[in-house]
Amino acid sequence: YNLTKTFHETTFSKKKSADYENYTRQWLRAVKPLLKKTGSIYVCCDWETSLIVGNILSEFFHVRNRITWQREKGRGAKANWKNGMEDIWFATNSDHYVFNLDAVKIRKKVIAPYRVNGKPKDWNETEQGNYRDTCPSNFWDDITIPFWSMAENTAHPTQKSEKLIAKILLASSSQGDLVLDPFLGSGTTSVVAKKLLRHYIGIEMESQYCVWAEQRLEMAKLNPGIQGYINGVFWERNSLAEQNSVHTKSKKDTSASDAQKSLFDFQGEL
């Protein structure tokens, strides 16, 4: 992000634009041969570095889109607009790449349900309410940064949420693929890759963050869930009550199914 910022015991100073361009070009050149032909790369940045990143990215890869992530939280400013957005550049190594659209649909509540001949049109009627599964755009407003009350939260100053990384990995990789994050931080990419049955490699220079990453990977064994992603779909922001309702019903249905299966198995043995 080219900021003057302290990450635990390491302080980075903001570089001049030319120096930041050289730095970005250097690490992208190093990553290029590691990415397979059908692979994709996502680069996060702020508004100030976005043009630099996008231009240099196009030197090595096929730039497909620029995603704008509305983080919700941001520092106020007296003489400027509050910065509550980040850019995420999406690029591929070739014209043949993985993109799983159905894996990243967003479930949205239908405010004014429309029917044709009494039947729902382009939406589903459920016990929890009326919803429509929509294709995501390049404006992501359904993902917040990790707050103190979230189990995934750490003291890392620029931690990405598991929901954000899950959307990227589900769209551009498949189960069993290998995911690389050369700026791992507190381990979110590796944790999400583990939860989504991907292999992972993370690189991080700060030892304390490596410890946090290992702890989170251990916790993922006990809790493989991703907040905001349930039953194969992403949910809107501020819909936790609905998510919990669906999750509880799903667990009950699974328990009932298991009990029924056990009953049939027992009868078959008589």
What are these regions (language model features)?
Residues 1-211, 263-270:
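Core catalytic lobe of class I
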Residues 214-255:
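S-adenosyl-L-methionine
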Residues 247-270:
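SAM/dcSAM-binding transferase cores
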